[in-house]
A protein has these predicted regions:
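Conserved Rossmann-fold NAD(P)-dependent oxidoreductase catalytic core, especially the SDR/UDP-sugar
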Residues: 79-123
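Glycine-rich "substrate-gating" loop/helix at the edge of Rossmann-like oxidoreductase active sites
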Residues: 121-124, 152-159, 179-189, 200
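Glycine/proline-rich active-site loop of Rossmann-fold NAD(P)-dependent oxidoreductases
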Residues: 130, 142-144, 155-164, 199-209
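Alpha-helical substrate-binding/gating segment
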Residues: 166-174, 182-217
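NAD(P)H-binding glycine-rich loop region in Rossmannoid oxidoreductase-like domains
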Residues: 26-80
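C-terminal amphipathic/interface module of NAD(P)-dependent oxidoreductases
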Residues: 252-286
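Mid/C-terminal beta-alpha module of Rossmann-like enzyme folds, strongest
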Residues: 202-249, 283
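Conserved beta-loop-beta element that borders a ligand/cofactor-binding pocket
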Residues: 101, 134-157
Length: 286
């Protein structure tokens, strides 16, 4: 979803895009498409920037097998990519590697305001993001600038969580999760891809980058605004205990955890958000 949107934006701005995909038809963009395999995820070609967004979908029951797929598709794949970059001719290596991560890095932090300098939290996602970022950082030894894309909930018509949420609310069964007091860091797809392209072009951007809008809201406020925009009720609510029992791990870390992440690095560096508030984002989506 994000890779395709990013490629389309880059092409509109006259950049040449090389898409790496396990399936040619899925790339959806790029004058060239290279087929990635488990052992050779990154066939060599000359690049200025490499954006690595691959990873097993986090949604679903976090069985042991699911957790292993999540880990391998992020940490181990990133390790393989960096290992391959080390074999490339120096003139072909990208000047910058932008590697996906997430605000799950911060763990469940209540009302604490979290910027890029905030410490790592605890939990499966925090451990995952730490090791994921560490794997990408190994490319710095090659003289490559590293940017860790700590992404919040991406709001997009094209996929991810938003179409599921919209469908639930449209059917009148939308509502808050648990108390609803947990902070929910989100970003509109337009700003997600805009920030990535902006980070490619701005050499001062390095290290962690929170990809989330300035207007962070609680889950209860998100619920209220989405219901109002759809003109639907939002009386339902899913008790925290039910989420923990029905979705072990995922329920606590993705739906109940509170991450009040703010995009300090982007704002300090001069990025202008197209949708800084949830009201603006929902107006564009609905």
């Amino acid at each position: 979803m994000i890779g395709q949107a990013l490629g389309q934006l880059a092409e509109r701005e006259n950049h040449e895009v090389v898409a790496y995909s396990r399936r040619t038809a899925k790339s959806g963009t790029g004058k060239q498409t290279w087929i990635s395999t488990a052992e050779h995820p990154l066939p060599e070609t000359k690049l200025d920037a490499l954006v690595h967004l691959a990873g097993e979908n986090l949604l679903g029951l976090w069985t042991q097998a699911k957790r292993e797929r999540i880990w391998k598709s992020r940490v181990e794949l990133t390790q393989k990519i960096v290992a391959q970059l080390k074999t490339w001719a120096p003139e072909n290596r990208p000047r910058v590697l932008l590697s996906a991560s997430g605000v799950g890095y911060y763990g469940d932090r209540g009302d604490s305001v979290l910027d890029e300098s905030s410490s790592r939290g605890t939990g499966f996602l925090a451990d995952l993001c730490e090791q994921w970022e560490a794997a990408a950082s190994e490319a710095a030894s090659l003289g490559i600038r590293i940017v860790h894309l700590r992404t919040g909930v991406v709001l997009s018509r094209g996929g991810g969580a938003f179409p599921l949420m919209r469908r639930a609310f449209a059917c009148g069964v939308g509502g808050r999760f648990g108390s609803g007091k947990q902070w929910m860091s989100w970003i509109h797809e337009q700003d997600q891809v805009g920030l990535i392209l902006w980070a490619i072009q701005n050499e001062s951007v390095t290290g962690p980058l929170n990809l989330c809008a300035p207007g962070v809201v609680t889950n209860a406020d998100f619920t209220r605004q989405l219901a109002a925009k759809l003109r639907r009720p939002a009386f339902m609510h899913v008790p925290a205990l039910a989420l923990r029992l029905l979705m072990p791990g995922m329920g606590q870390e993705m739906l109940l955890a509170s991450q009040r992440a703010v995009p300090n690095s982007a704002l300090r560096s001069g990025y202008s958000f197209a949708h800084p508030t949830l009201e603006s984002a929902l107006a564009a989506l609905i």
